[in-house]
């Protein structure tokens, strides 16, 4: 177990197997040292995390859903790196989509659940640029979907 996975273990996190795509696309594409990971939905061990922020879900629950997405992103990175998460050099950028009402404005605070988790788990390598975008609906009614760009070695 490498450094990043040791840190995750200390946080009580074990990465799941990388989720299979839900439609006709690949989970990631590597170009040189850049890894582009498809959107990961808020699906944890207990199933889909569904809801609409500003309606039946609050920002704190949305942040937890975003953390679940970040865990799935790391699982995809690990798979792309042949099982060696320490090949990850840095998180470059996240794009977070938040299933939210038209008048909900706390998308950034919701996606902080992913950003805070990655910073804690990966340290300096977890700092990234980011967008947080409102969506009228997301696949399967999930609360959050996040895609990521990573640099690997």
Regions from the PLM with identified roles:
Residues 1-153:
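Short, polar/acidic, helix-capping and beta-turn segments at strand->helix junctions
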């Amino acid at each position: 177990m490498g450094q990043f996975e040791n840190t995750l273990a200390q946080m009580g996190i074990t990465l799941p197997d990388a989720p299979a795509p839900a439609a006709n696309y690949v989970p990631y594409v590597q170009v040189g040292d850049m890894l582009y990971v498809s959107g990961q939905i808020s699906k944890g061990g207990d199933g889909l995390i569904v809801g609409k922020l500003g309606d039946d879900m609050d920002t704190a629950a949305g942040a937890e859903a975003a953390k679940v997405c970040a865990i799935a992103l790391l699982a995809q990175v690990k798979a792309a790196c042949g099982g060696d998460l320490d090949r990850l050099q840095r998180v470059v950028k996240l794009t977070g989509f938040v299933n939210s009402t038209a008048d909900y404005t706390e998308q950034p605070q919701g996606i902080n659940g992913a950003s805070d988790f990655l910073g804690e788990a990966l340290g300096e390598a977890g700092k990234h640029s980011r967008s947080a975008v409102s969506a009228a609906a997301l696949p399967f009614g999930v609360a959050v979907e996040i895609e990521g760009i990573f640099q690997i070695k």
